[in-house]
Amino acid sequence: MLAMLLWVIVFQPCARAQRVLKFSPKVLEVLSTPPLELKDDDTQLNRLKKERFNAALNEAKARFDLYKRGLTKLPDLIEVGQRLFSAEVDLYDKPEDRARVLERHLEVYNEAEENLEKHVKEGLATQADLEQLRYNKASLEIDLLNTRNSISQQQPAPQPSPH
């Protein structure tokens, strides 16, 4: 019985560590983003938006560290990633800026989805994790499409040329 207990204590962390997934370069790039600087001349609203972004970024980094140590699960990372991306988009007021940020996020989602599909096939991640990621990606694509539509509606319609 003691031998079994020792085996669990000694080898279980190793088994957990082996199941930690490799993350795509774009995901790791997001996690290396520095926090936003709070400036004295920030409006109260902008300051709060920056604080929210920084909180989501710090949580993402902390959860990633927990994940690497086997102390949290992939859905927690996907969820905080969604909050981080949402907070980043909300930093921008102009639709063109929002579209640019959403396009960058879509690149991250595409790379992460491809990576996660491989992990599901290898038995290292669940189909449920992949579907959660796909749901978030589809939500982002809807936001991007709506943003692009609002940009095109702001553009003046071309005037017919006089004959």
Predicted feature locations:
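Short N-terminal segments immediately surrounding and downstream of signal-peptide cleavage
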Residues: 19-40, 44, 161
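Bacterial N-terminal signal peptides
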Residues: 1-9
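Amphipathic alpha-helical coiled-coil segments
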Residues: 85-99, 138-154
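Charged, solvent-exposed structural "stalk/scaffold" segments
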Residues: 45-78, 83-85, 98-141
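Short, charge/polar-rich alpha-helical segments
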Residues: 32-50, 87-99
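Boundary at the C-terminal end of the N-terminal hydrophobic targeting segment
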Residues: 15-17
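Terminal, low-structured helical/coil segments at or just beyond the last alpha-helical repeat
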Residues: 152-163
